[in-house]
Structure formats: structure tokens, C-alpha cells
């Protein structure tokens, strides 16, 4: 059996989707042959896991396609890439290569790696599946093009993998996909990496990881943290990810949190250190498809506080402290105080639950269950 993976999911230098794909491919049973329709990529997971030999580094990028800078340079690049198929961007090169591979028919099953309709005119009667990672676009009503593509592909795919039961139920509810057409396969857990255990931050701190836009509910978390430190002023809030936006800076200043909130760009080893030494990890998001940072925190024995939304109870089980939070209303401050008064025994019991919950998540298991989906189709 030969499975063809197309290019889209491997395009970014680093992303959750590319990590998922590389993990399942590297753990795939030996009876599953595969090919990735990809010519150019600087994806770190592909390189670190040595999944493709001799892959080319992208030559034409938004920064260098012309040898000078000007306003809207990246937007012009995007327009050229979209409307001029011969423009030699990695996306155009990889798309054409994927189309050639799909037209050749030299595969038994296509595993489409995102949600884009480009391949439908070329696939003929060959079956395809794809993986649904979340339903953010539909639930928060943005990126209409992606919503449309997901709806079309959900009807035409022979089968769909959902990464959580919650995501499956959203897909069934929103697009009317039959239960039997969707298989839930959870992610595996992260590999524990070696790191210097010396503290990066000397104060006790609450750790926030990842993006902070809209549905991530970060603004409310700032307000909650502000309330908490009125009494417990020794704590900091450490945020990994991008620089604070103007709105975030304004709110941080308004809440007088400038000396209490720290933003950091971190490496994988630094992130492991931050998890390991954190007083707790907080995940206030209103919606996620899976929530991999939960398992990262579990891996480094960090107590976890979760918003009781979407897939979080499914993934974390009873190995977390749950709170209820949405814009302008939250009981997170009370839960932080509750954790503050935990005895050492209670913290150790919580961490033991985390360790046991983490055992459910294994990439070999994820790959095996994915291979079973492939086999059942063919």
C-alpha cells in the first residue's frame, strides 16, 4: 500500500500540523509505503527527523524575491504567488509538483495535509482522506475560504481523521458529516528533551505558552492575574510567543502589570526549562482542537490550570485544575488561590495524575491507528 502526502502541511518552517505529520510518518508501520509530494521546504521537523532526503531549501522568499525593500513587499509577494502560477515561490513549485504526482496515479490513497481544493480536478477516482485539527474557522467565523474548502472536502473525502472527540462532534454538528465517516485519533505525547534545570526566572511564575489572539482569551487572563497579584505580589506571568501587541501593552499598563508580565522568545530547551520550573501552566483558550501544550506541561511535571472548554476535559482528564473563563467573567483568580494553598502532598498527587494521563498519548499508537484507517479504506 502506498500513501501520498501532499505538500501543504509541510510548507511552514514550524507548525503543529507539520509536527503531527512528521510524527505519524516516522512511526508508520513498515507495510505502509509513502511519498511526500514536496520539492522545497525549510521545515524543521522534516529535517530533524530526516524524513526526506535531499529536499531543497526555498530560494525565493518574501524577503529576497526582489533585492530592495518597499512598503507592502510581503503582500505583493503573496499576490504574485497567488495570481501568477509561474512565479517561482516554494508554494507554486510544490503545488505543481503535487499536481504532477497526483495526476500520475502512482499511489493508492492520498492523505491531503490541510484543507485546500486544488487537487480535486486531478485526483480522478483515487480515494483521499484528510485530518481535521480543529473547527476554529467555523466556530469563530473567520477565513471563509478555508471554511468553504473544509465543507467541500468533508463531503468528497472517503474518510476523515479528527484529533479529538470534541472536534469530531463539531464537524458532525456544523457540516453534517456522518459519525461513521470520522475516526478519532489522538496525538502522541512530546518527547522529553534534556535541558539545563537552572532557573531562567527566579520569581515564582505562571506560564502561558503560544498565541494570544482573540479566542485564546489572553486579555481576560491578564485581568485575572491582576486580581491574583493584589494579594500574591511575588508572582510573575511569563508568556512565550510573539511580542505583545499595542492593545496588550495598553492593557498591561492600565492594569499596572508592567513589572509582573514577561514576554520571551524561547528555544525548545528553554521552554522545557520554563515548564519544569513554573509554579503552574495556564491555558485559558475558549477553543482548541487538541491542546498539545497540556501534554508538554505534563511531560515536565508542571501543574496545569485549564479553561473547562472544548476538548480540554477530554485530553486532560482529572489531571488538571479547571476554571470557567470567558471575556469579562472568570473564576481563574479563585482557582489560583486554591492552588496556592495546596500542600506539597496535593501538588505531588496532581503531578502523579498528570504522569498517568500522559501514558495514554503515544505517537506509535497514533501512527498505528492511522495505518488502520488506511488499511480499512483499501
Report residues per predicted region.
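Carbohydrate transferase catalytic cores enriched for Leloir-type hexosyltransferases
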Residues: 1-378
Amino acid at each position: 500500500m502506498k500513501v501520498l502526502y501532499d505538500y501543504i502541511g509541510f510548507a511552514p518552517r514550524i507548525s503543529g500540523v507539520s509536527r503531527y505529520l512528521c510524527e505519524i510518518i516516522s512511526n508508520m508501520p513498515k507495510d505502509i509505503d509513502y511519498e511526500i509530494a514536496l520539492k522545497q521546504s525549510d521545515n524543521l521537523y522534516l529535517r530533524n527527523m530526516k524524513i526526506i532526503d535531499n529536499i531543497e531549501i526555498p530560494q525565493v522568499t518574501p524577503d529576497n524575491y526582489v533585492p530592495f525593500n518597499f512598503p507592502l513587499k510581503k503582500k505583493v509577494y503573496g499576490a504574485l504567488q497567488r495570481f501568477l502560477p509561474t512565479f517561482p515561490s516554494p508554494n507554486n513549485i510544490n503545488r505543481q509538483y503535487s499536481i504532477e504526482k497526483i495526476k500520475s496515479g502512482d499511489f493508492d490513497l492520498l492523505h491531503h495535509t490541510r484543507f485546500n481544493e486544488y487537487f480535486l480536478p486531478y485526483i480522478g477516482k483515487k480515494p483521499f482522506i484528510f485530518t481535521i485539527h480543529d473547527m476554529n474557522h467555523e466556530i469563530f467565523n473567520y477565513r471563509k475560504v478555508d471554511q468553504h474548502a473544509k465543507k467541500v472536502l468533508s463531503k468528497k473525502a472517503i474518510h476523515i481523521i479528527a484529533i479529538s472527540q470534541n472536534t469530531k462532534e463539531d464537524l458532525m454538528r456544523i457540516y453534517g458529516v456522518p459519525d461513521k465517516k470520522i475516526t478519532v485519533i489522538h496525538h502522541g505525547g512530546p518527547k522529553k528533551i534534556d535541558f539545563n534545570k537552572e532557573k531562567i526566572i527566579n520569581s515564582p511564575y505562571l506560564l502561558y505558552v503560544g498565541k494570544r489572539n482573540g479566542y485564546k482569551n489572553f486579555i481576560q487572563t491578564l485581568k485575572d492575574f491582576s486580581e491574583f497579584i493584589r494579594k500574591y505580589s511575588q508572582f510573575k506571568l511569563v508568556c512565550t510567543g510573539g511580542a505583545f501587541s499595542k492593545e496588550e501593552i495598553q492593557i498591561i499598563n492600565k492594569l499596572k502589570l508592567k513589572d509582573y508580565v514577561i514576554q520571551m522568545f524561547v528555544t525548545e530547551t528553554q521552554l522545557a526549562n520554563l515548564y519544569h520550573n513554573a509554579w503552574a501552566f495556564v491555558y485559558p483558550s475558549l477553543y482548541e482542537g487538541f491542546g498539545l501544550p497540556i501534554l508538554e506541561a505534563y511531560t515536565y511535571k508542571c501543574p496545569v490550570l485549564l479553561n473547562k472548554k472544548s476538548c480540554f476535559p477530554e485530553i486532560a482528564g482529572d489531571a488538571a485544575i479547571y476554571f470557567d473563563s470567558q471575556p469579562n467573567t472568570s473564576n481563574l483568580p479563585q482557582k489560583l488561590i486554591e492552588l496556592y494553598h495546596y500542600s506539597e502532598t496535593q501538588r505531588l498527587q496532581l503531578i502523579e495524575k498528570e504522569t498517568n494521563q500522559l501514558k495514554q498519548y503515544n505517537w506509535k499508537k497514533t501512527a498505528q491507528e492511522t495505518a488502520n484507517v488506511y488499511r480499512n479504506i483499501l
